[in-house]
Amino acid sequence: MAERFHANSDFWDSDEMTENIPLYEKSVQWRNKTVHPRDSEYVIKEEKYLFLELFSEKFREIIMFLNELPVEMFSCIDLLFYVNGGIYQYLPHKNFVFTWEKNGEKMIKHVSELLSEDLSECIVAIPIFVPIRKILFLGEFGYREAIIDYGRVLSEIMHCWPQAELFRRFENRSMNQKFRLDGIEKSILSIISC
């Protein structure tokens, strides 16, 4: 199985790949610009969005640190944070977050049970792996790239939080169900608490 993955995920310098790489890069910029745009009336009214100044200094520092990283690094990750009792989605290079779940205590209680760790008083990073965003353009090589980017984001978050704890061994199916994810096109592979 591993041999097949390595062989199929190699980079092939083909005409199709040469055409698809710039298309993928444009799709990343397009998504960052059009999904959750800064000038949206919903952002301005703060209906589903909250500006960073409403959060703790620690959370703002984490977001500002992440905002210095390349947008492409987050192209196949929906990065959620449990903070202040809610679950919010990080939006690369923006000064606000999307309200993913207002009442996140119930969900984080389930996560705590799965991890045998009380996370209710922590900031929790929940990176959702969405490899299809790269696979559509780069095929199997895109899947390999997505896995590498997922690991890079985890590494950067761990670097930002010196006392962070990484959880990788948990029942993925139950975790994915709790977050309404199919476990194939979208899944949770790791969680970080601080």
Residue ranges and their predicted role:
Residues 1-194:
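N-terminal accessory segments that position/regulate proteins before the catalytic core
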